[in-house]
Amino acid sequence: MPFLQRTDKKDITIQEILYHQSGLPSWIPFYQEAIDKDSYDGRLFSARKDVHHPVQIGTTTWANPKFKFKSEYISPVKTGDYTVQICDSLWLNRSFRKVIEEKIAEAPLKQKRYVYSDVGFILLGMLVEQLAGMPMEAYLQREFYEPMGLEHTGYLPLRRLCQIGNCPFQQRPFL
C-alpha cells in the first residue's frame, strides 16, 4: 500500500495479516477523529451509568449522548463528498479515508506474535480495492455472492440487505 511505504509496516505480508501475526494493533479508534471533543463535558464513555453517561452501549460501557460530530467529516445527509453511509442519517466524508490511512501509518508496530487485529483486515480490504480497481462491495458481489447464488448475504447491508427488509441492527439508542 503506497501510504505504508515509508513506515515500519512496509514489509508486512498478507500471510502475517491473515494469521494475525503482523504486529499491527488489535484496533484503532478511528471514530474519535470524527467527534468534536469540545461538544460534551467529561469523558465520552464511562464504566458506570451517571448523569453524563445515561446510555448503555455495552455490558459495562455507558455513553454520553450529548457529543457532536465534526462537520468536516460527518453530515446528516448524503451530499457532495459525504458519500459513505454509516446509518440512515449519518454520512461520512470520503476524505476520512486519509485519516484512517494516517492513523494506521502512525500506529506503532509491535512484536510479531498472535494478536487479533481488525486493522489488518482493514488493510486487506484496501488492498483488494486497489488490486480489483473497484469498491469491495462490488468485488464481493461479482466474485462471490452472485456466483454462489447468495441473495441474503452481502457487504454494506444498508445498501442492499435493508432494502429487502433484513435489518437486525436498526435499533440505535446511541447514534
Identify the meaning behind each predicted range:
Residues T7-L175:
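Short, surface-exposed loop or secondary-structure junction motifs
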Residues L4:
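Acidic catalytic motifs of isoprenoid enzymes
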